[in-house]
Amino acid sequence: MGLVTANTVGLSGLVAPKPNVQIFTATSGTWTKPPGCTRVYIEVIGGGGGGGRGESAGGNGGGGGAMARGVYDASALPATLTVAAGAGGAAGTTGTSYLGGIGGTSSVTGSGFTLQAFGGGGGCRPNGYDSGGGGGGGTSSAGARGTGASGDDSPGIGGGPTIQGSTTGDSLGGRGADGGEGPAAGKCAEFGGGGGAGARAASGGGANGGSSIFGAGGGGSGVRSSGTAGSGGAWSSYTAGGGATGLGSWALIATYTGTSRDYGCGDGGAGSPPGGDGGAPGGYPGGGGGGGHYANSDGGAGGRGEVRIFAW
């Protein structure tokens, strides 16, 4: 959830110095251990998957990025660490064959040290059929795309690790949540990203993106031709929806974009409403993008990843 940066009072009654806080949002960087520090806390969040473009059916949502974190003795870490914040998955457009991009991996690496969080799966091409949402990113692998074909609307599988009893439905530990099958909502996760919502070919509303307690929310799906678009999944929740609110009529995309935060993770973007301009981007870090509506509107881009390092 993030470390509080306010000064603290030690046992001696003296005010301790503020921790050294460094936030990385670019794809490459270097962290140098501050002199005198004894503890280091690290958070890494993978990029969100992009939402799928609609195609005679609503577009499906992208999966959210995972969160990984740890507290370390400063003496156990190398003097420098290489840092990479994963990019958000590209929006599904004609230029991407209607496919939303898979979110990038965020990592902190050094001699004998690795901490990673993987990105969410992108929305698939619906091809005029029901289609499955992108899987949420995990702490050992990225989420996968779902499928959209006659008789096959399978959801994208959440990223690893594989955890016994957590291969279907909502996930736990670092496993990413599965996307929604067909027009169903995305599944929820603990440290993995929430699953993107599945989309329907028939008329009717979209489905909600899956949420995550510590990871980022998945994107909602767009509508076929009428009804209310699916809402994005939320950070700090284990119930689908709760992120950007899906709407039932045209509005500016900014109205239903996922919430971004300087702590925790981002929420998923909502799907496109009827006549809308496309699915909304996911919030940063890690929110999945929303799906477009049936009339060939683009999906929303996934939220970028992020790395935060606190030393004191």
Placement of each model-derived feature along the sequence:
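Residue-level detector of flexible, active-site-proximal loop/helix-junction positions
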Residues: 10, 121-124
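Short amphipathic beta-strand/extended segments with alternating polar/hydrophobic composition
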Residues: 114-121
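Collagen triple-helix signature
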Residues: 61, 88-92, 100-103, 122, ...
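Bulky hydrophobic/aromatic "packing anchor" residues in well-ordered structure
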Residues: 117, 284-286
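Generic hydrophobic, helix-prone segments enriched in Leu/Val/Ile
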Residues: 4, 77, 129-130, 134-154, ...
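Enriched but not universal
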Residues: 1-41, 71-73, 306-312
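A residue-level signal for beta-strand positions that form part of recognition/binding surfaces
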Residues: 21, 39, 80, 105, ...
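Glycine-rich strand-loop-strand elements at beta-sheet edges
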Residues: 23, 30-34, 44-110, 123-128, ...
